[in-house]
Regions:
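Extracellular/periplasmic periplasmic-binding protein-like sensory domains
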Residues: 141, 248-328, 408-411, 422, ...
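Extracellular/periplasmic Venus flytrap/periplasmic-binding protein
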Residues: 83, 93, 133-134, 142-252, ...
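Venus flytrap/periplasmic-binding-protein-like
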Residues: 77, 125-127, 132-136, 213, ...
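Bacterial N-terminal signal peptides that target proteins for export
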Residues: 1-10
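Bacterial N-terminal signal peptides
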Residues: 9-18
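Sec/Tat signal peptide C-region and signal peptidase I cleavage site
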Residues: 19-25
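Beta-alpha junction/loop-to-helix N-cap segments that form part of ligand/metal-binding clefts
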Residues: 27-30, 43-53, 57, 62-138, ...
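Segments of small-molecule ligand-sensing domains
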Residues: 308-321, 332-406
Length: 441
């Protein structure tokens, strides 16, 4: 009798332990991370995912999201599309019972390759500052979110800035602009809209491709020297950026007439070019720096506690790192908002999608988050999965970036018909019936 009772007690204890483990896993919200920490784009990957992970750790250190702790795991993609797809399939179903909230590959190629999969799996695909521009139209792309800045908004804002520097958009007529772009889906994304802007404003556009990864550009810069453009727009990535700046110096093209895009704007893009980078201008959706309350909180609760993700602590507060923090804020806010509708518990990707689509970050909320000045005000909706569309311009002084402009807004009214036409074409090709956003709730 005693033996049977003991065995029953042991069985109950094992059962309770298993239940407790499962409950713990089920009480967490999972973020699958298709990261890249090796290869020619490792600087971007390590900085971005370092900031993202440190923000998740910071949230956990302060109680999680309404008591729900966050968990994550990484799968190395090396920025290779095929590996990114493999990682997506490996991670999409969650971890130990914790459901996946969203996928954040930080790669246009991987985003394109997993778009249909994420839609079928009802898992939000977050492409902050990049991705398919037409995925801004949430009526056709319910699960894709090019948060803050889509590629068309990026180049529209750059042209608007060049117009400001020229005395007005009407003064662009007759100007010569070269776009030097990375030979990838990301690099080619804006060619069509740049030509449309050239036709509208009367400037001459020259498009020059740099093959991946971008460490050989001599012929392109010789062409630029012959063309004598007024401005060069650099749509680079990774090693391509410092090579471009050094190549420009060799042919005598001034750095302060080169404008880097959103992936040509980090310390890792400018510093390796040395003196050739001084004066270089780029856009940004967020500044570098460590003085924001949220970054100070991360330093206190995560980094000073010995739990920071960065291998090199000097990268704390850099452009790539802070973008990861911004991305963390937006992902966690979507979860928090969705919890207000569906309950303070781990949520499905479909439920988190609702949170992303209803994101509204005004100055009051950004101040509460300690991110005022770090994140631009955003408001998303069924029809608008971008929510921002503004950039600031910064200039490299040889050691650091300095902001040189206020917010410059893209011409979203001009871009919207182009976006909708592309989205409708995609819908027709895929047999998608667009949602009626007037009935979205």
């Amino acid at each position: 009798m005693f033996k049977r009772s003991l065995l029953s007690s042991l069985a109950l204890a094992v059962s309770l332990s298993a239940t407790a483990f499962i409950a713990k896993a089920d009480g967490e919200q999972y973020f699958p991370l298709q990261s890249y920490r090796v290869g020619p784009y490792a600087a971007g990957g390590t900085g971005f995912f370092g900031g993202f992970i440190d923000y998740l750790k910071y949230v956990n250190a302060n109680g999680g999201v309404n008591g729900v702790k966050l968990t994550w795991s990484e799968c190395e993609t090396e920025y290779v599309v095929e590996k990114g797809v493999e990682c997506y399939e490996r991670l999409k179903n969650g971890l130990n019972g914790a459901p996946a909230a969203a996928t954040n590959p930080l790669s246009v190629g991987i985003a394109y390759a997993t778009l249909d999969r994420s839609t079928a799996d009802k898992l939000p695909l977050i492409t902050i500052n990049h991705g398919r521009t037409d995925s801004t139209d949430g009526s056709v792309f319910p699960y894709a979110f090019p948060l803050q800045l889509n590629p068309y908004s990026e180049v529209s804002a750059i042209i608007n800035y060049i117009g400001q520097q020229s005395g007005g958009l009407d003064k662009l007529s007759g100007k010569k602009i070269v776009t030097l772009y990375h030979g990838s889906p990301y690099g080619k994304e804006t060619n069509e809209v740049l030509q449309a802007l050239a036709d509208k404003y009367g400037f001459t556009l020259t498009l020059l491709e740099v093959p991946h990864p971008g460490n050989e550009q001599q012929s392109q810069w010789l062409n630029i020297r012959r063309a004598k453009p007024d401005w060069v727009i650099l749509r680079g990535w990774g090693v391509m950026n410092p090579v471009a700046l050094k190549s420009a110096q060799k042919v005598g093209f001034p750095a302060d007439r080169i404008i880097g895009n959103i992936w040509s704007n980090s310390e890792e893009d400018a510093a390796p070019a040395g003196a050739a980078a001084k004066g270089f201008i780029s856009i940004t959706t967020h500044p570098s720096g460590t003085t924001f309350p949220v970054t100070q909180g991360i330093k206190k609760d995560v980094i000073d506690a010995g739990h920071g993700d960065l291998a090199d602590p000097k990268r704390f507060g850099t452009v790539y790192y802070n973008l990861g923090v911004v991305n963390g804020i937006l992902n966690v806010e979507a979860v928090r908002l969705a919890q207000e509708k569906y309950g303070h518990k781990p949520l499905s990707g479909e439920q988190v999608r609702w949170g992303f689509e209803h994101l509204k970050l005004d100055e009051a909320r950004l101040k509460e988050l300690g991110a005022l000045g770090l994140v631009q005000p955003l408001q998303l909706s069924c029809s608008d999965h971008e929510g921002g569309g503004a950039v600031r311009f910064q200039q490299w002084d040889g050691e650091k970036w300095n902001l040189i402009s206020d917010w410059v807004q893209a011409d979203r009214a001009l871009l919207r018909p182009i976006i909708e036409a592309s989205a409708q074409k995609y819908a027709k090709e895929k047999g998608i019936t667009p949602r009626d956003c007037s009935k979205a709730s």
